């Protein structure tokens, strides 16, 4: 029937009817099993709420103990092809599989919290779905409420699992996996920048952290998924961002964009659900299936999804499979009614009228025929790795004009555009024509699960997930050479079990059905997969593995079904389901709709056939007569005549009963009548179902079990559960007794409470998943410096206990806690350094010379309110702010101009004082009539004092004798003025006090305060009474003690503090002090020019000047004037290395072309490109190695075998494999030899195969010269590189003296190599040279703009200064040339054993080593060169230019600077202890290195100081810090002079941009450094107290055995080469490459693969190696020659000596083999044709480049 016609419903009724005959615990289990199948595989579609989306072959198994009343002994569910696409693509208006909705709706709040359903996700804003959560995999939120009782469904689901004996823990795991699938749909992906550096990062831009990666935005959802799958969050997130595929026979990792990551996540969801369904069904079958030998008969229900007119989920493959299965079943139906019956009738000589019918055999044959049917072709094309268009072409060739039911559109000559538009084929099904698109069909048919996912799941900590991915339903493809390496996998589209009848051959006692031949065929088809032998060249993984695609598996499963149905002893029954209307309206009959279905299924023709011949059963005469029981009737004649008598007696119609030649044909009705089926007593069995633990035995009962008969007819007992259809009151598989038969507490808690109560929490699972695998390794000694550092770390962090880090930081591992302590200690050191810097800048001067708020007379007079100056005024030694005071002066009638005339002067005379109010005198009181005539000292020598005769003084005179006496007025005013307007005090320097003392002034200082008693001693003590009163006669005007007065008289102008303390006036001291402070105080001692203050001032100044002097020195070093003469042509051999990672083609082409176009002798350049892994970067359409090879012109047909070499990595990752290509690259007239090394990794590597990082790429090239110079054994790939350089390119590797390292995003100037080599030749003590690097993307963004000036000045100032000492501390890896060996002694330098071993360190077990090796390998390489070759120099030359790409985004820029600062700090720490750094005085490099280190750490303080200076200048224009400004001007002015002198006028603008961005460089970078100082997630070797061995390694790569990589010396290699070639005459060592010719014999390697063919018209030397498989045209012919008398010819040794002499004096640019032969013939005077093979072989010598052509 069609979809929505009720097939699933009727199937459930049918099953219930069968099970009602044996109501046993087993029948209940079978009912539960069918319900589980429906729950997992049915969905709500547009036409029905129970649309089946998987084919079902449901088998009920019976024993043969009773031929009349067989016993039900088991059952089997065989599922066919679940519609997996529905999981991730829910059609509009439909639902996904019911179980997902059950889980969401039926879980309790506690369970929802555990499953992560309690968090709001994607809340829809549409009016129709307010409040619903939007789940991507559940369709529109309205589908959550469509009349299906999901809550009850979930309870039934759990009950069914428990009744089928699933453990509770397993049920919980199943629910977790289902929740995981829903959460995978919620993941949101975005593009981000990789800001965390790993050891595997490589290349230029990408190495700087600029690699675009895909990240998960909602990390909370990701953590839920990781917890339930038992995986690490980081590993899971990374796995979504890439996918490993097999492209052109190569494993390639594709870096995915967010869209690709979404597809990757969808694949994961489909895979998990498919495996879960397979797992549950197989587990159910294990519980219900009987032993195959005990099964005698079966009743099978076959139900496949209905015919699909449209592709609802977008999966053409699912639609094709569904319709193919429906086509097959319909064809079987027609065959059963027409063809098979006709054959039997004809054989029995029974004639019936013929009936015409629609025959769909052509469609079935076209779709399902083995070998050349459509599904077979699809599978074959998938296995061959063909494209969709190639599939279409194959279908066209197969079916065009050959099968009318399959039409392939278009033709061969169709244009590409129209071909893509028409890429579809049409199948004429019995139900109508359907167009199937081929776009993506090949890939969909593969249904491959990437090896990345399998590798990820291999690391799961969840036993259940491990079991899911370990079941037989998951077919894996392993590498042919490494069986443990899973390349890819596939969820089987074929059932795990076969029908019982397919397993059994025909037996006499059973009607279970195959004959021997069919049974053997089906058995072999089901249990074995043909293995394709892989001979010759390597094929795709699918072709070599023999794994079938989905089409092949589905076809074989349909074939088994068809053979089972077509078996001879099977009786088929057909049920046609017709839907009454297309609109799902109850009680409405649409005749048009029904008529269309009747016509489609040919029901009228079938009915007509049955009217003519309704013969379902054929009985031989003996069996028929036995059933007819004619023993009492005497009939004389043959059996046939007796049968005719019986038929006449029964009076059955002729279309239901006919006599044949050997038996009788009967209809079902006639057979039932004959066998008296209705009269038999069918015993009904029952068992105690109150407890699952019952005996399970069957007990005959006199009456039927409960409702065993009612279930067949009662509409209240619908199946499979009326809740699926939306009627909660109805019961289906479950009666009220079955929903939950047990009432114990545990069960009810499980059913309605929290099934995860005794389960691990999500947090525990997440922590378990994040744990690293640990295994023991050998103990490694800890260095003394490391021990001292650890001691310092604990000293700084001892107050933080380990348990606190473990508890609050959630850090369980001891090594990570130690790393955290180190980070925290480093933070403390950084901030302590900043604090020390702040202390010296701010606090230190204040401590040595406390700040004084004093003003000298000159300073006071300068504050006169004129020319923008402020207005200050002094009163009795106290300085006030007149500007602030004037607006509030009372009375307001006094104009401000009148007040301003007092600005800058001492106005003490304006304020007469009442002595008695301010001084208690000697006796405790002073007579109020006593006056003090105070005249302030004129300390400036100018008119800065106001006399007491000033007219305004009367306004402040409130003394006793006035008519307005206010004794305390002055004191109150001073208190108010000091509180609001105080600026400081009048200052007297000790020197000036001494001067005044010499001028007979009675002035002195006590404890820093200056007192002037001159007027008191000179007679200024007066008396005056108020008007009308007289002055008492006994007034004592001497209110000061004589000892005090005499002290000032005897020691004028001095510090009287000690003398004051020694006075014997203890009783009077307080009163005298009060009088001095109130009446005679004139200011403070000014110590600003004292020795301590001068020290404080000049100490900071000296440091500033010292640092600035370094700047000056750097400036002088940068002024390297002189003519930039272009050197003469140089004859040194150089290697130009370019590491490639994920760069785009444009960047790679620019870099490679710029190297090739350098104005340096092409024959002496070797371009080496090292591709770090088989990776397709985002935005690229090919792997990076393929891009490089395409640029260099290497065709895809050149495919060398990968060879082993030792790499930098953890564990087994140290074993890497690589391919070697060589040839000539021609660009713009330059022809340059090249070598390409492609790191492809071992077969077991499925993720980023071969990728080991930039440092490893450098090591690949560094090890070759090292092995050569030290004559060390080489790995196979190194031997091949040596062979390619020496024998193919034609240059002895020892000739190369320099290596130029350039990043893949860097473009070099044409003369850069020439200038660098010239520098090396001018100074033989030079080991490394770098040039000036500028930016190509300077104006791309604001981030790049702020870097332009910094790049320029860092080269032309810092590096130029370091170059003066020959100690450039950082030779950038993007543009540096190194000296490979010493010019005089050939001693290895760059490739010396010490440097190579130190640089190849793989134990990165500390933060320090991680910062050295992973964050700044270029700088560390320079550090190693300076450490191990201290007598050699590193240099910077500005004449060599290159241009690179700077980070364009803020995130990448900060990431880059964080790594740079980390690397700088740690490398400077390495350099500081070195004694060998050159220099002189305080300008030694050690000092400069220390200053650089310190300046890097305290950059935030520097920025803060500059901001403070600016604030100071803005706030107080009167006080200008000239020194600071001069120093700053010197720093930046000298920098400006550099580019001004060099006429780099554009740098003026870039300098302004840089200065504006100074906060960016000074604050965020160091603060980011300290806040997120490099973490240690990749710690590999750490101490652990938990392991007695002392060390553990955290690695899942296994241990590396160096013996797994065979090594041999070059001499051994050559010896074996010679022996191999002399022992066999069919192989010549002269099997070279003739490039540019049509006949070409590749140079072979020892390892048996053809060499590469560069694209050039030149011929490379024909050197082969031992195991060359392709014969050369120069095959040795010694064995075929006639043995002549060769005594007159010179010996080989003589020829060799003469050749060497010729080469020593010949022009190597023009010499050829032919010219050498002619020279030899002249020298020896004989014809040397017989010696030609020896001359051409090159034994004992090597022809130099250019290659000598074999033309003799």
Swiss-Prot record:
UniProt keyword annotations, A-Z: Actin-binding, ATP-binding, Cell membrane, Glycoprotein, Glycosyltransferase, Membrane, Motor protein, Myosin, Nucleotide-binding, Transferase, Transmembrane, Transmembrane helix
- Location of the protein in the cell: Cell membrane; Cell septum; Cell tip
Boundaries of every DEK-C domain copy: 1689-1744
Domain Cytochrome b5 heme-binding stretches = 852-940
Q: Write one Gene Ontology MF term.
A: cytoskeletal motor activity
Question: Region entry Actin-binding: which residue ranges?
Answer: 558-582
Q: Which SMART domains match?
A: Cyt-b5, MYSc
Recorded catalytic reaction(s): these are: [(1->4)-N-acetyl-beta-D-glucosaminyl](n) + UDP-N-acetyl-alpha-D-glucosamine = [(1->4)-N-acetyl-beta-D-glucosaminyl](n+1) + UDP + H(+)
Induction of expression: Expressed during hyphal growth.
* General function of this protein: Polymerizes chitin, a structural polymer of the cell wall and septum, by transferring the sugar moiety of UDP-GlcNAc to the non-reducing end of the growing chitin polymer. Important for hyphal growth and conidiophore development but not pathogenicity.
Q: Quote the protein name from its UniProt record.
A: Chitin synthase E
Organism this protein belongs to:
Aspergillus fumigatus
Q: Which gene encodes it?
A: chsE
């Amino acid at each position: 029937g069609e979809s929505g016609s009720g097939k699933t419903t009727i199937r459930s009724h049918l099953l219930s009817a069968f099970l009602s005959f044996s109501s046993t615990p087993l029948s209940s289990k079978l009912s539960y099993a069918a319900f589980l199948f429906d729950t997992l595989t049915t969905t709500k579609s547009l036409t029905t709420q129970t649309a089946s989306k998987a084919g079902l072959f449901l088998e009920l198994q019976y024993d043969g103990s009773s031929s009349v009343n067989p016993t039900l002994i088991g059952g089997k569910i065989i599922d066919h092809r679940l519609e997996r696409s529905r999981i991730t693509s829910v059609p509009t208006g439909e639902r996904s599989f019911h179980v997902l909705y059950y889980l969401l709706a039926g879980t309790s709040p506690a369970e929802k919290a555990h499953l992560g359903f309690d968090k709001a996700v994607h809340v829809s804003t549409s009016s129709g779905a307010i409040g619903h959560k939007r789940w991507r995999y559940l369709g529109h939120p309205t589908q959550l409420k469509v009349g299906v009782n999901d809550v009850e469904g979930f309870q039934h689901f759990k009950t069914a699992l428990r009744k089928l004996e699933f453990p509770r823990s397993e049920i919980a795991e199943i629910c977790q996996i289902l929740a995981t699938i829903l959460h995978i749909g919620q993941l949101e992906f975005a593009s981000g920048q990789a800001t965390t550096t790993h050891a595997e990062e490589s290349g230029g831009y990408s190495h700087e952290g600029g690699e675009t990666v895909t990240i998960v935005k909602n990390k909370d959802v990701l953590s839920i998924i990781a917890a339930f799958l038992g995986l690490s969050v980081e590993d899971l997130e990374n796995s979504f961002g890439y996918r490993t595929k097999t492209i052109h026979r190569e494993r390639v990792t594709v870096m995915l964009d967010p869209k690709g990551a979404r597809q990757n996540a969808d694949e994961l969801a489909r895979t998990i659900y498919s495996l879960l369904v397979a797992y549950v069904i197989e587990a159910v079958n294990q519980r219900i299936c009987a032993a195959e030998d005990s099964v005698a008969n079966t009743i099978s229900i076959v139900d496949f999804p209905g015919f699909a007119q449209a592709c609802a989920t977008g999966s053409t493959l699912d639609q094709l499979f569904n319709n193919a299965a429906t086509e097959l079943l319909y064809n079987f139906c027609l065959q059963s009614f027409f063809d098979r019956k006709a054959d039997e009738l004809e054989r029995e000589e029974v004639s019936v009228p013929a009936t015409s019918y629609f025959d769909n055999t052509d469609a079935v044959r076209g779709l399902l025929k083995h070998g050349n049917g459509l599904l077979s072709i699809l599978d074959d094309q998938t296995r061959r790795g063909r494209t969709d268009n190639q599939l279409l072409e194959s279908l066209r060739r197969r079916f065009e004009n050959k099968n009318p039911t399959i039409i392939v559109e278009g033709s061969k000559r169709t244009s590409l555009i129209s071909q893509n538009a028409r890429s579809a084929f049409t199948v004429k099904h019995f139900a109508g024509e359907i167009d199937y698109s081929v776009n993506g069909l090949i890939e969909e048919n593969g249904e491959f699960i990437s090896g990345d996912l399998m590798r990820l799941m291999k690391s799961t900590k969840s036993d259940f997930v491990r079991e899911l991915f370990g079941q037989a339903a998951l077919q894996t493809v392993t590498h042919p050479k490494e069986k443990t390496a899973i390349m890819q996998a596939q969820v089987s589209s074929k059932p795990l079990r076969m029908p019982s009848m397919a397993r059994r051959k025909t037996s006499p006692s059973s009607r279970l059905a195959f004959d021997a031949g069919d049974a053997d065929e089906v058995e072999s088809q089901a249990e074995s997969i043909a293995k394709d032998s892989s001979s010759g060249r390597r094929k795709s993984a699918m072709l070599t593995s023999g794994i079938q695609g989905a089409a092949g598996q589905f076809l074989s499963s349909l074939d088994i079904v068809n053979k089972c149905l077509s078996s001879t002893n099977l009786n088929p029954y057909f049920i046609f389901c017709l839907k009454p209307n297309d609109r799902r309206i109850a009680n409405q009959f649409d005749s048009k709709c029904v008529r269309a279905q009747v016509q489609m299924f040919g029901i009228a023709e079938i009915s007509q056939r049955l009217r003519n011949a309704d013969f379902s059963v054929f009985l031989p005469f003996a069996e028929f007569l036995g059933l007819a029981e004619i023993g009492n009737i005497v009939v004389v004649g043959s059996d046939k005549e007796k049968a005719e008598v019986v038929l006449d007696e029964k009076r059955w119609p002729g279309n239901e009963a006919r006599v044949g030649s050997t038996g009788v044909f009967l209809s079902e009705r006639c057979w039932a009548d004959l066998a008296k089926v209705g009269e038999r007593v069918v015993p009904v069995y029952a068992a105690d179902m109150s407890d699952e633990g019952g005996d399970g035995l069957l007990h005959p009962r006199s009456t039927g079990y409960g409702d065993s008969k009612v279930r067949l007819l009662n509409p209240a007992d619908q199946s499979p559960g009326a809740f699926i259809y939306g009627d909660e009151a109805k019961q289906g598989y479950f009666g009220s007794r079955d929903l939950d038969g047990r009432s114990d507490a545990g069960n009810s808690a499980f059913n309605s409470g929290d099934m995860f109560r005794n389960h691990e929490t999500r947090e525990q699972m997440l922590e378990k998943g994040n744990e690293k695998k640990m295994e023991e390794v050998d103990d490694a000694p800890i260095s003394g410096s490391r021990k001292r550092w650890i001691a310092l770390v604990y000293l700084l962090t001892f107050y933080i206990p380990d348990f606190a880090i473990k508890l609050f930081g959630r850090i369980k591992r001891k090594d990570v806690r130690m790393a955290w302590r180190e980070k925290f200690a480093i933070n403390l050191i950084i901030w302590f350094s900043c604090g020390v810097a702040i202390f010296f800048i701010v606090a230190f001067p204040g401590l040595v010379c406390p700040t004084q708020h004093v003003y000298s007379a000159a300073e006071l007079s300068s504050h006169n309110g004129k020319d923008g100056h402020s207005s200050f005024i002094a009163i009795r030694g106290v300085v006030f702010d007149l500007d602030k005071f004037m607006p509030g002066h009372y009375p307001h009638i006094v104009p401000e101009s009148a007040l301003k005339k007092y600005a800058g002067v001492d106005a003490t005379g304006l304020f007469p004082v009442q002595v008695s109010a301010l001084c208690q005198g000697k006796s405790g009181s002073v007579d109020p009539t006593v006056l003090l005539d105070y005249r302030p000292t004129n300390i400036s020598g100018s008119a800065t004092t106001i006399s007491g005769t000033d007219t305004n003084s009367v306004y402040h005179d409130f003394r006793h004798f006035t008519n307005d006496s206010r004794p305390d007025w002055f004191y109150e005013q001073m208190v108010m003025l000091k509180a609001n307007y105080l600026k400081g005090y009048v200052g007297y320097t000790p020197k000036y006090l001494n001067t005044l003392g010499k001028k007979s002034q009675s002035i002195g200082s006590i404890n820093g305060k200056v007192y002037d008693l001159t007027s008191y001693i000179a007679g200024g003590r007066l008396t005056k009474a108020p008007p009308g009163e007289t002055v008492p006669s006994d007034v004592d005007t001497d209110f000061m003690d004589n000892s005090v007065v005499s002290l000032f008289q005897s020691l004028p102008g001095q510090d009287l503090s000690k003398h004051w303390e020694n006075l014997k006036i203890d009783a009077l001291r307080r009163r005298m002090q009060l009088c001095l402070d109130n009446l005679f105080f004139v200011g403070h001692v000014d110590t600003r020019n004292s020795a301590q203050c001068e020290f404080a001032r000049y100490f900071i100044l000296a440091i500033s000047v010292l640092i600035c002097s370094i700047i000056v020195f750097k400036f002088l070093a940068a002024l390297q004037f002189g003519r930039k003469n272009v050197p003469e042509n140089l004859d040194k051999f150089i290697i130009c290395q370019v590491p490639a990672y994920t760069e785009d083609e444009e960047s790679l082409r620019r870099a490679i072309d710029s190297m090739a176009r350098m104005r340096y002798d092409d024959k002496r350049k070797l371009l080496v490109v090292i591709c770090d892994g088989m990776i397709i970067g985002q935005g690229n359409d090919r792997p990076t190695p393929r891009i490089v090879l395409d640029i260099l012109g290497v065709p895809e047909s050149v495919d060398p075998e990968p060879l082993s070499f030792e790499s930098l990595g953890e564990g087994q990752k140290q074993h890497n494999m690589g391919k070697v290509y060589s040839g000539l690259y021609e660009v713009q007239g330059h022809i340059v030899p090249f070598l390409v090394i492609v790191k492809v990794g071992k077969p077991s590597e499925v993720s980023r195969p071969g990728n080991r990082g930039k440092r490893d790429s450098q090591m690949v090239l560094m090890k070759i010269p090292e092995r050569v110079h030290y004559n060390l054994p080489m790995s196979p790939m190194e031997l091949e590189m040596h062979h390619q350089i020496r024998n193919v390119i034609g240059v002895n590797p020892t000739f190369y003296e320099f290596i130029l390292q350039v990043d893949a995003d860097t473009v070099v100037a044409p003369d850069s190599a020439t200038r660098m080599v010239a520098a090396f030749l001018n100074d033989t003590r030079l080991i490394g040279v770098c040039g000036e690097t500028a930016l190509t993307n300077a104006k791309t963004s604001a981030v790049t703009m702020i870097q332009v000036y910094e790049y320029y000045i860092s080269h032309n100032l810092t590096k130029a200064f370091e170059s003066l000492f020959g100690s450039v501390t950082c030779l950038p890896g993007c543009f540096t040339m190194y000296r490979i060996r010493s010019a005089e002694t050939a001693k290895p330098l760059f490739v010396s054993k010490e440097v190579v071993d130190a640089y190849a360190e793989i134990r990165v077990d500390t933060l320090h080593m991680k910062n050295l090796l992973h964050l700044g390998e270029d700088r560390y390489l320079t550090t190693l060169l300076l450490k191990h070759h201290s007598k050699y120099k590193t240099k910077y030359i500005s004449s060599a230019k290159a241009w690179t790409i700077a980070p364009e985004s803020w995130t990448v820029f900060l990431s880059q600077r964080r790594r740079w600062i980390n690397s700088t700090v740690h490398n400077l720490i390495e350099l500081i202890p070195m004694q060998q750094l050159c220099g002189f005085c305080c300008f030694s490099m050690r000092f400069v290195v220390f200053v650089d280190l310190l300046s890097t750490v305290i950059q935030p303080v520097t920025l803060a100081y500059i901001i403070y200076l600016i604030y100071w200048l803005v706030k107080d224009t009167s006080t200008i810090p000239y020194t600071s400004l001069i120093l700053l001007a010197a720093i930046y002015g000298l920098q400006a002079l550099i580019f001004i002198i060099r006429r780099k006028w554009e740098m003026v603008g870039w300098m302004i941009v840089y200065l504006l961005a100074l906060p960016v460089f000074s604050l965020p970078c160091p603060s980011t450094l300290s806040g997120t100082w490099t973490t240690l997630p990749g710690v590999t070797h750490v101490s652990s107290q938990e392991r007695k061995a002392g060390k553990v390694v955290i690695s899942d790569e296994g241990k590396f055995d160096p013996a797994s990589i065979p090594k041999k010396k070059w001499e051994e290699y050559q010896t074996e080469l010679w022996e191999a070639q002399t022992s066999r005459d069919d192989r010549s060592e002269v099997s070279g490459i003739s490039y540019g010719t049509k006949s070409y014999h590749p140079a072979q390697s020892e390892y048996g693969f053809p060499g590469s063919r560069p694209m050039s018209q030149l011929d490379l030397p024909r050197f082969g190696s031992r195991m060359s498989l392709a014969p050369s045209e120069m095959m040795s012919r010694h064995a075929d020659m006639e043995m002549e008398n060769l005594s007159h010819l010179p010996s080989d040794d003589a020829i060799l000596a003469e050749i060497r002499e010729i080469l020593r004096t010949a022009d190597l640019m023009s010499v050829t083999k032919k010219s050498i032969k002619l020279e030899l013939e002249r020298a020896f005077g004989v014809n040397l044709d017989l010696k030609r093979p020896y001359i051409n072989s090159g034994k004992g010598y090597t022809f130099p480049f250019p290659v000598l052509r074999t033309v003799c």
